[in-house]
């Protein structure tokens, strides 16, 4: 029972049998419409966002399993803030401000795939992403906000 795994990045809820899915899965001879339908059903909550998808295929029986990952942190942040692009000059150009409660929401969504042991550390990881995107957090530089998290200034919001 040999299994192959294909990993692809697809827009949530709108997979099609065309590229990138079709060329990646076509050689395995599985029913593409079943795969597309299952991916779209499982990724519907992430509509409009790029979502990592892992398709495991049994070469002998042509059965497949689909795992939907969470979108990249940058995609979740942009979705929360309603922005289309991050800053071209992250150190100099601030394009938006991420409130601490939204940072916590994103950390909760991504928690299983973060390196953090608790939500406080998860929020700090999200803030780290904000640095490279040219965003502020609660009206300040994300690095300052991280220090505030360490100092306990957001403990009332960051309740687990």
From Swiss-Prot:
Residues 138-160 have a biased composition (Basic and acidic residues). InterPro entries: Ribosomal_uL11, Ribosomal_uL11_C, Ribosomal_uL11_C_sf, Ribosomal_uL11_CS, Ribosomal_uL11_N, Ribosomal_uL11_N_sf. GO terms for biological process: translation. Residues 137-160 are annotated as: Disordered. Transmembrane segments: none annotated. Signal peptide: none annotated. GO terms for molecular function: large ribosomal subunit rRNA binding; structural constituent of ribosome. Keywords: Ribonucleoprotein, Ribosomal protein, RNA-binding, rRNA-binding. Part of the ribosomal stalk of the 50S ribosomal subunit. Interacts with L10 and the large rRNA to form the base of the stalk. L10 forms an elongated spine to which L12 dimers bind in a sequential fashion forming a multimeric L10(L12)X complex. This is Large ribosomal subunit protein uL11. It comes from Methanobrevibacter smithii (strain ATCC 35061 / DSM 861 / OCM 144 / PS). The gene is rpl11.
